[in-house]
Amino acid sequence: MAPAGQTTYQKDERVLCFHHEILYEAKILDLRHTDPDDRKSPYEYLVHYKGWKNTWDDWVPQDRLRKFTEENRELATTLRREAEAALRQKSTKTSLKKKGGSDHSSARGSEERQTSVPGRGTKRARDNDIEKEEHFYTRPSVRIVMPDNLKSLLVDDWENVTKNQQVVALPAKSSVNQILDDYLKEERPKRTGSSEVDVLEEVVMGIRDYFDKSLDKILLYRFEREQYRVLRKRWESETADKGPLDVYGAEHLTRLFATMPELIAQTNMDLQSTNRLREELSKFTIWLSKNSNHYFATRYVTASNEYIEKSRGVPNPAPGTATSRLV
């Protein structure tokens, strides 16, 4: 954040500005303090969106603006494409629903990791479950950018584990901790002030926390649980402070981002905070996509017959939704 009395953006500067969930090219026409009597109050900016009528000119707070950099322009393009794809998907689902089809879908492979087995209960309990589910689906969707090459890697990962009975060689060549540290090292210098750096570090800390809590509950396929059981036993017996963040890598981290929209949807964050988190997470997935050759495993290990037999006896965790199993 700029020091009191200074501004991060200038009049006539070319910028990118958020309007709802999309970044648009804009120009700053004017700026002023939010409190005319307080020279230390934050600035707000009058922006004109390129190609829009003047009636859309608007005073916006600084947190809706982004510098007109190549990286932010790429993010703007990606966000627009994601929004267009979501709109087409929504249109297709609406059409299917009118024809009697289901409007709920799940990512490939998620069923094996997250399938819930409903038990018997009273009608009131079942009604409450239905009410909770309906409430979940009425919440605003949180779309995180998932580049095509990451989607392909997730599909390959699913096939390697569930069909080919292979596991990722662990420890990964780059652990989750190492990947996030590399991202911080590269991203910090690009942030314009201390508040931007604080947001970045807070988001990365949250990713670490989510991964640590969710790995054994929602990110592992059944076939991988024997591998995790052996690793966990080793962590508990060793004095070295090691854990999932030090051993697992890009494959399982990307699985986390595939489930992140559901996790975020079940939080109580306001719209502004949700949009900012979505932006930060999308920046990371774009960065990981560009560096995928460096971080993702080049080979999987074919499991032995002994491992296959043992994997059949390792139970799944308690069933439930992704977030309920994080508790």
From Swiss-Prot:
One of its GO terms (cellular component) is nucleosome disassembly/reassembly complex. Coiled coil: none annotated. Residues 100-114 have a biased composition (Basic and acidic residues). SUPFAM superfamilies: Chromo domain-like. Its main location: nucleus. InterPro entries: Chromo-like_dom_sf, Chromo/chromo_shadow_dom, MRG, MRG_C_sf, MRG_dom, MSL3_chromo-like. The keyword Transcription applies. One of its GO terms (biological process) is DNA repair. Residues 85-132 are annotated as: Disordered. One of its GO terms (molecular function) is histone reader activity. It comes from the Eukaryota. Residues 13-66 form the Tudor-knot domain. Residues 138-312 form the MRG domain. The keyword Metal-binding does not apply. Keywords: Chromatin regulator, DNA damage, DNA repair, Nucleus, Transcription, Transcription regulation. It is found in: Nucleus. Component of the NuA4 histone acetyltransferase complex. PANTHER family: MORTALITY FACTOR 4-LIKE PROTEIN (PTHR10880), MSL COMPLEX SUBUNIT 3 (PTHR10880:SF15). Involved in deacetylation of histones, chromatin assembly and chromosome segregation. May act as a transcriptional oscillator, directing histone deacetylases to specific chromosomal domains. Component of the NuA4 histone acetyltransferase complex which is involved in transcriptional activation of selected genes principally by acetylation of nucleosomal histone H4 and H2A. The NuA4 complex is also involved in DNA repair. Belongs to the MRG family. This is Chromatin modification-related protein eaf3. It comes from Emericella nidulans (strain FGSC A4 / ATCC 38163 / CBS 112.46 / NRRL 194 / M139).
